[in-house]
From Swiss-Prot:
PROSITE patterns: FBOX (PS50181), TPR (PS50005), TPR_REGION (PS50293). The keyword Transmembrane helix does not apply. Keywords: Cell cycle, Leucine-rich repeat, Nucleus, Repeat, TPR repeat, Ubl conjugation pathway. The lineage of its organism: Eukaryota, Fungi, Dikarya, Ascomycota, Saccharomycotina. This is Protein DIA2. GO terms for cellular component: nucleus. LRR repeats lie at residues 300-323, 353-377, 454-480, 499-517, 518-542, 562-585, 598-622. Belongs to the DIA2 family.
């Protein structure tokens, strides 16, 4: 229990430090240190052994400390530095070396504090001692210091040496000047022969490089400038304006912030370029929310007065409504005709005014659309009606990719759901569809027929949507027999969904029908989804021609690593072409489940493995698995991810990388929170 208190206090202290509450952080770290010192030696030995550390300190077997003691000291020393209490920081840094003389953290902390105090000779000696101890640890105990710590020590040592040498040279030079100093005659002021009575300026005349340099050199200068710098240069004088306007091919990518003054300068700048070059257009324009007070009028200014086309337009707003953004895009002929990739991140206040029909009709060149919408809760007095799609002719679009993300649930979802009734026309060419956070219970689209109306769909991503069930999706696709080109399927249910007991036998899915529609499947992601394991086995069998290269079955409530060992064996045997296996937070993890994976890993081509958030995963179990894999592939894994695996010690991670079991290991013990919404993050970071 007290271990949990120490970890919790450490986490709270870090939060206080990040929130700049340094006094609160120092107090929390001090209390945690006091608690860590309250253990008996026998208790500390048990705790250290539990996390994979030696019972006693390697550098001094007579000492034993809590595993978190060094981290707590380091954090408190950093806090003292922020509070400008360098003497206390120095004391904590010195004690860090006493706690673990083989860890370079203490030497780095102590050296930097000494540098702040101006005691450079002592700091240099500290860094030298740290490198000496690191060498001894490697020679005696085969412990390799992390490369990033070695780089810091070498860099700081080099900096101090250069500083001391510079001081020595300056001191010698000053001494020589003092000894050899002689009186010198002052040079009389030079009189300019062309300007009688006026002294010639000793300083060099300033040169206007933009006015004098060749165009080729100006191009190289301007090519390395950001949008803000370009606009400022454009406003310097008429000559600069004249020369910059004649280089339109340089200005292809713009990143703007919502400052009205800067936005006005940008609009005038591209307007001048367009007036000189009729066919001028740029590659991309990205506008991010800066000044919230000026955001709406800045975005409206951009969309209404922009006189050029752009192939890619990304707008991120916190206040400006998506309804107005879409309206102004549709009204700007130059903009709507040229945009191919459109991304809008904005709030929605009135869903019935979100005129997607007009957007599809007018942006005829658009192939990629991304909508990230924050739906506001409607007021009771606001009356809105669905946009009458049936009253308008629905034109065929060129969309190849469509992403629809809702940050919150709302009755306004019905206004974006209705478009899927016309999937056979709107999304006939669609290859990638991503929908997350939508409540499909509000409309009539929860029968999923609209998905089978997209014959060219290759990638389908459905995450945290309400009103859509996984078994219903599979049944619909199989019954209709479309889409047959599906290569990537991701289905993740919302959290806290009701438990679904639907079994595969109740679906009536035949193996031949499954093979017909899922024979091209290359990746399958069912994280956090409740499904009958037999259904997963059926989905993998059609891909027996070794197409499945990526599988994510982490956090699946009905797939147990304790009770479903036979099914797991069959699943892993169906994956001979697998390169990416993701098993974060697997249900009911047991050693027997890991043994099933180890025995069947020989039949895979594994390059990347994710075993994050399995607290009971032991280091020796992981090593047994990696040794089995290295017997097949001498190069080992490209990437091993074990975030949140608290039972795997840092020494084990170091051993894995040192012996080539994995080229890159991602291991962060602090990542203990699932993320609310993250389409490419597996819900945690």
């Amino acid at each position: 229990m007290s271990e949990d208190i120490i970890d919790r206090s450490l986490e709270l202290g870090i939060q206080c430090f990040q929130g700049e509450d340094y006094k609160g952080a120092a107090e929390l770290f001090s209390k945690s240190l006091q608690l860590a010192r309250s253990y008996t030696d026998r208790s500390l030995e048990g705790i250290r052994e539990k996390v994979g550390l030696p019972k006693r300190c390697l550098h001094d077997p007579s000492r034993v400390y809590h595993p978190r003691y060094l981290v707590l000291l380091d954090n408190r020393a950093a806090t003292w530095e922020k509070l400008n209490k360098l003497d206390r920081a120095l004391a904590d840094a010195a004690y860090m070396i006493t706690v673990d003389a083989y860890n370079l953290k203490g030497y780095i902390r102590r050296g930097k504090v000494l540098q702040k105090l101006g005691r450079y000779e002592e700091a240099l000696q500290v860094y030298e001692n740290g490198l000496k101890q690191a060498g001894e640890a490697e020679k005696t105990h085969a412990i390799h210091a992390p490369q990033k710590f070695l780089d810091i020590v070498y860099r700081q040592r080099s900096t101090i040496k250069e500083l001391l040498q510079s001081r020595a040279r300056s001191s010698r030079s000053l001494t020589q000047q003092t000894v050899a100093k002689e009186p010198k005659l002052k040079r009389p002021a030079t009189i300019d022969s062309l300007m009688p009575g006026k002294k010639r300026s000793s300083s060099k005349a300033k040169i206007d490089y933009i006015a004098t340099l060749p165009v080729e050199i100006i191009e190289r200068i301007m090519a390395n400038m950001d949008t803000r710098s370009i606009i400022r240069c454009y406003s310097v004088c008429k000559l600069w304006k004249y020369r910059l306007e004649r280089l339109p091919h340089l200005y292809q990518e713009f990143r703007l912030s919502c400052c009205y003054k800067n936005m006005l300068g940008y609009v005038n700048f591209v307007g001048a370029l367009a007036s000189r070059t009729a066919e001028y257009s740029c590659r991309s324009i990205q506008c991010v929310s800066g000044n919230v007070q000026e955001e709406e009028k800045s975005i409206i200014l951009l969309l209404s007065r922009l006189m050029i086309g752009t192939r890619q337009l990304a707008l991120m707003a916190k206040k400006c409504k998506a309804e107005r953004i879409i309206q102004h895009i549709c009204e700007n002929k130059k903009l709507r005709n040229g945009v191919q990739r459109l991304s809008i991140t904005a709030p929605v206040h009135f869903g019935h005014k979100l005129n997607l029909h007009e957007l599809y009709t007018r942006t005829t060149s658009m192939t990629h659309l991304e909508l990230v919408l924050n739906f506001h809760t409607p007021s009771e007095h606001v009356g809105g009606h669905l946009f009458p799609w049936q009253d308008h002719a629905v034109a065929e679009t060129n969309l190849e990719s469509f992403t629809l993300m809702a940050r919150n649930y709302s009755v306004h979802h019905v206004n974006v759901i209705e478009q899927f009734e016309y999937s056979s026309v709107l999304f006939k060419r669609l290859k990638k569809l991503c929908i997350t956070g939508i409540d499909f219970r509000l409309g009539d689209r929860n029968n999923l027929k609209w998905i089978s109306d997209m014959p060219n769909l290759q990638e389908l991503w459905l995450e945290r949507n309400t009103g859509i069930e996984f078994h219903e999706l599979i049944t619909q696709i199989v019954q209709v027999g479309a889409p047959k080109t599906l290569r990537h399927l991701t289905f993740r249910e919302p959290p806290n969904r009701h438990f679904d007991r639907m079994d595969q036998s109740q679906l009536g899915l035949g193996e031949e029908a499954l093979r017909e529609v899922f024979q091209s499947l290359e990746s399958l992601d069912l994280m956090n989804t409740r499904f009958d394991p037999q259904l997963l086995l059926l989905l993998l069998q059609p891909a027996c021609e070794n197409r499945i290269a990526r599988l994510n079955i982490g956090n699946c409530p009905r797939l147990s690593f304790a009770r479903d060992l036979e099914i797991l064996t069959l699943i892993f045997q169906q994956l001979p072409a697998l390169t990416d296996l993701l098993l974060p937070n697997v249900m009911e993890y047991t050693r027997q489940g890991m043994e099933v994976l180890r025995k069947n890993i020989k039949g895979m081509k594994l390059k990347r493995l994710d075993l994050s958030f399995i607290p009971s995963l032991k280091g020796y179990e992981l090593l047994d698995l990696l040794k089995e894999l290295k017997g097949i592939n001498p190069l080992g894994l490209e990437t091993l991810t074990i975030n949140g695996c608290t039972a795997v010690a840092p020494q084990t991670v170091d051993y894995i990388t040192r012996n080539g079991y994995a080229q890159k290991v991602m291991c962060a013990y602090e990542r203990t929170q699932w993320e609310h919404l993250g389409i490419n993050s597996f819900w945690y970071r």
